């Protein structure tokens, strides 16, 4: 199996190289999905034995994603023409500060609700904090609001890249970056931290173009964040060290274990028929209007009912989600739908003429690219993407409003 995995890893890299041609951003979103899949599903095969029951679904998903990426790469993309930024002055800076403040408030309010700033890190450890935090009436909305800070950081970084001489803006960015990542570490939430770094990478690549040096600069903190956060969740901060990091990383195959368990159980219980798609309207309803709203996703209630009371989530990932929905055809459907959406978004991303708007548009969907492979394509994980997209629409609406008001202020400059 490791030899076959090595072959498919090479196929993944070849597909990434082919679809990246002709795109200033190397066709970022679909390629990020392929790379994430390789890291999460193919690389662990070299460190742990797995059965045929999970190996074949993984390869089916891998082939489907690669083929879909190649097929959808033919989407027409208009020529890019760069125009002056659509947002100028301090409006953009203020929006970034506003979104960062909302996200930071949500993260630290979650810490307070769980017993104190360091209670999750020192007292509970791992997933234990969910029992203390998730039963709060505002836990759901706080989790959604926490996604405001990554988009705010993307706005601040884009504002600085737009005018690199404004080091005051960069200083504000660094302050909020420290607060945001510090809060994520105290909560031991990996998804938010990894997605934040990926969003910032998308902004930099859109402004500066893809460079190997920049990619390595982002890859190193990504690896550090994922491994350290994983070690903290598995071993606890008291046992944190090089040995625990290496051990937890080499044995970190929870998504593979969950995938294997769900596939085996499905063969006895039957397919779910994409019932997880009902999660999206359910989780968009505030708990204040529906006190008995489920605390976990449909798939978790079906496959892990013993943990539903504390809201713990076992991430099925794209492979298990597709298989439990409709077997191997389900894997193909989910893979093609996921890659089709990413390719459509990427085509629009490359068509946007303004670099600032393009950078923010990419930042909206980068978290979904990572979470779709890691936690599932459909269901409640779409809620953060919808929230971030609403933030994007607010920013663009204010930009258009500013363009309408600018002629009245006499601020039009001749071309």
Model-based region annotation:
Residues 100-119, 214-296:
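Aromatic-rich transmembrane-lumenal/periplasmic boundary elements in polytopic membrane proteins
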């Amino acid at each position: 199996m490791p030899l076959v995995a090595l072959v498919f890893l090479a196929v993944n890299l070849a597909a990434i190289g082919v679809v990246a041609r002709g795109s200033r951003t190397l066709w970022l979103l679909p390629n990020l999905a392929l790379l994430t899949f390789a890291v999460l599903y193919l690389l662990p095969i070299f460190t742990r034995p797995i059965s045929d029951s999970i190996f074949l679904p993984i390869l089916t998903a891998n082939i489907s994603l690669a083929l879909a990426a190649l097929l959808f790469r033919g989407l027409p993309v208009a020529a890019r023409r760069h125009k002056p930024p659509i947002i100028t002055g301090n409006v953009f800076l203020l929006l970034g500060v506003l979104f960062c403040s909302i996200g930071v408030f949500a993260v630290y309010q979650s810490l307070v609700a769980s017993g104190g700033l360091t209670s999750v890190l020192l007292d509970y450890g791992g997933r234990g904090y969910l029992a203390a935090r998730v039963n709060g009436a505002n836990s759901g909305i706080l989790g959604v609001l926490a996604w405001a800070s990554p988009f705010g950081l993307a706005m601040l970084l884009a504002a600085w890249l737009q005018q690199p001489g404004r080091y005051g803006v960069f200083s504000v960015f660094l302050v909020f970056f420290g607060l945001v990542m510090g809060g994520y570490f105290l909560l031991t939430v990996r998804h938010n931290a990894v997605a934040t770094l990926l969003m910032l990478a998308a902004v930099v690549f859109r402004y500066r173009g893809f460079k190997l040096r920049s990619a390595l600069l982002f890859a190193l903190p990504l690896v550090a964040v994922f491994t350290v956060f994983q070690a903290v969740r598995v071993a606890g901060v008291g046992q944190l060290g090089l040995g625990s990091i290496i051990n937890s990383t080499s044995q970190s195959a929870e998504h593979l274990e969950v995938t294997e368990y769900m596939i085996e159980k499905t063969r006895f219980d039957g397919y779910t028929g994409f019932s997880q798609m009902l999660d999206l309207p359910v989780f968009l309803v505030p708990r204040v209007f529906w006190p008995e709203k489920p605390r976990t996703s449909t798939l978790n209630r079906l496959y892990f009912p013993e943990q539903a009371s504390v809201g713990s989530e076992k991430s099925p990932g794209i492979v298990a989600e597709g298989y439990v929905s409709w077997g191997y055809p389900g894997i193909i459907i989910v893979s093609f739908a996921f890659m089709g959406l990413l390719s459509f978004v990427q085509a629009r991303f490359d068509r946007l003429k303004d670099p600032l708007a393009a950078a923010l548009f990419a930042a909206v969907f980068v978290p979904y690219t990572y979470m779709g492979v890691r936690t599932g394509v459909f269901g409640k994980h779409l809620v953060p993407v919808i929230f971030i997209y609403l933030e994007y629409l607010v920013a663009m609406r204010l930009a258009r409003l500013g363009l309408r008001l600018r002629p009245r202020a006499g601020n039009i400059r001749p071309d």
